[in-house]
Each structure stands twice: as structure tokens, then as C-alpha cells.
């Protein structure tokens, strides 16, 4: 875990799928290690069931989902290391909020391997949704697409 001290911007990508087809995408820019991810997300989200690739974006900028969400982690975060990094760099409530989510992750088994979820949906429904989008890996396609697009945008921004 590396602290970047609120330097620079990172892309926040939201994908919209119709079945297995990418229907639309929106991109916003958030401050690295900032506190604007929630506001940016609220401007680019469609308000449907949302799968999040974790809750931290652009370092320790974060979104605590409010409704109709599935937070997905491919691996269980090292809670001790995350808490240590949060305490070392932030004197606000983000540590408590982030740790509150990470401590409530539930391990599920999928046909592609284990995932860790935090959701306000019925766990069986969340699993069904996640597995419905697993095509070539344990990461659901909406998350996989957003990750690939976000990396490409980030690399392009670094070169410009």
C-alpha cells in the first residue's frame, strides 16, 4: 500500500451492461487519496444494481455504497496492513468507514473460485448476479471491463 498524498487524478469508470453486452460507460476523474469519489460516482452512476471493484479507488479515495450494491474483492484484504496504512496517513473518518466494510466481507464460492462480497442484497441473489457475469475469470465482466478501461485511460492521461 502506497500513499500518494492527494497528488494527481485517477479515472473512475462505470459500465452499464444489457445482459452480456456493454451498453454504455461513463468516466469521471477523482483525486488520488482524496474524498471526491462518492460525489463523482453519484454524477456518473445510472442508479441500478451496482457492482463495485472494492470500495477504494485512486489510492484511499473511497465510496461506501448506500443501496442496491455488490462490492467484490477477488482476494481478502489484509486488514492489519490496510488499517496500519489508514492510521499512518489519515486523521479523518475514512479509516473507520473503510474498515467497517472490509470487516464485513463474506466469502462465497463461485465456479471460478472464491470471492469476497459486501452487499445489501440477499447473498444468494448477489451470488447469482455475480456468477451470471463471470465469463473468463472470477471477476464479473462489468468490473473487468471497467478495470481495463480505467487502466487505459490512466495510462493515456500519464502520457498526455
Language model region names:
Residues 60-113:
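Long, charge-dense
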Residues 19-45:
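Nucleic-acid-processing active sites and adjacent nucleic-acid-binding tracks
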Residues 114-160:
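Charge-patterned, long linear interaction tracts outside catalytic cores
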Residues 1-7, 13:
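Two-metal-ion RNase H-like nuclease active-site motif
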Residues 35-63:
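Short HxH-centered metal-ligating active-site micro-motif
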Residues 11-19:
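Short beta-strand elements
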Residues 13, 48-49, 68-70:
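Structural motif
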Residues 2-3, 53-62, 74-78, 122-124:
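Gly/Ser/Thr-rich loops at beta-strand to alpha-helix junctions
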Amino acid at each position: 500500500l502506497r500513499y500518494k498524498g492527494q497528488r494527481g487524478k485517477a479515472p473512475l469508470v462505470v459500465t452499464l451492461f444489457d445482459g452480456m453486452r456493454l451498453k454504455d460507460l461513463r468516466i469521471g476523474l477523482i483525486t488520488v487519496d482524496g474524498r471526491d469519489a462518492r460525489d463523482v460516482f453519484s454524477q456518473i452512476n445510472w442508479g441500478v444494481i451496482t457492482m463495485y471493484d472494492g470500495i477504494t479507488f485512486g489510492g484511499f479515495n473511497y465510496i461506501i455504497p448506500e443501496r442496491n450494491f455488490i462490492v467484490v474483492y477477488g482476494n481478502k484484504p489484509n486488514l492489519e496492513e490496510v488499517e496500519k496504512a489508514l492510521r499512518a496517513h489519515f486523521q479523518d473518518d475514512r479509516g473507520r468507514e473503510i474498515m467497517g466494510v472490509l470487516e464485513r466481507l463474506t466469502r462465497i464460492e463461485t465456479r471460478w473460485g472464491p470471492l469476497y462480497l459486501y452487499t445489501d442484497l440477499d447473498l444468494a441473489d448477489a451470488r447469482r448476479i455475480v456468477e451470471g457475469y463471470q465469463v473468463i475469470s472470477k471477476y464479473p465482466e462489468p468490473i473487468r471491463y471497467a478495470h481495463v478501461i480505467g487502466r487505459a485511460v490512466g495510462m493515456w492521461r500519464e502520457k498526455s
